[in-house]
């Protein structure tokens, strides 16, 4: 009897163990470790910033001296990082292709503090040849793959060796109140100092830019939904589409240049489609543009670009459609040796244009316009 009762007790205990619920597993914490604010300065600042970039929530670059032949490479930033330049950022001299600065990431905020300057001291490379020979010159700022509402604000860039800002692979980038001042290059051999070269990018807004240079103020080589507004362009080649054609991406669509001024420049407004190539230029708008002191062409639209303007017969492989030119003020703007408006289109390749309140005078009438849409003047 005792044995029976003992067995029953053991069975009951076992049943309790079996019936007891298993302990709840502990879920791993979903709270990410907070990233720290970081400040870097001096000759070791660039290397330290690059090594620590993933761990910093904010990066302050205070009077950083970047060594010669080095890219200040901030292309591995954590999402949402803010990068602020303070004081003067400088770069050592070396002949190489660059870039001197590279920034990439999602929801990245790049800012210039009051009085801050990014100064690559491009005059050390200037020789009048730009990217066509002479010294090998580094491009300045590769703003590549900046996405998800990234922004660049209040930068002051002084004297780039050649091109200033390359925008490529970006989607949702806003650039506000940036100054690119290469005006010293007018007398010291600056060449190919494009301010903004844009390719394969979408949803780009550049607002309030001030540009003094010796090449395109803006060149949109490919991309969609791009706006340049409230800008000043002085000394260069004006507001350009292209050249389009002969690249991996040859589509330009929905690009607007509005409420801006082009002065002291070779060209005012220019659209360049490369001869013998294919692509698309659609939905480009120039509106509310003031031209003054233009040396060569007030408005130049060409489908025979071949490394130089107006080379031979135009071709039709890159149609220019849905173009709008309106409220273009350029009375007396063009030098007497220049041309007010030149339009050279391939057969049937320029269509559905809007042309309203366009006044560009002071220069000569171009005598070799071709296939001009009836609404336009040439």
Swiss-Prot record:
Q: Which domain of life is it from?
A: Eukaryota
- Gene Ontology biological process terms in this record: cell wall organization; pectin catabolic process
Query: One Pfam family this chain carries?
Result: Glyco_hydro_28
Identify the enzyme class. hydrolase
UniProt record similarity statement: Belongs to the glycosyl hydrolase 28 family.
List GO terms (cellular component aspect): extracellular region
Organism encoding this protein? Aspergillus fumigatus (strain ATCC MYA-4609 / CBS 101355 / FGSC A1100 / Af293) (Neosartorya fumigata)
* UniProt-recorded name of the protein: Probable endopolygalacturonase AFUA_1G17220
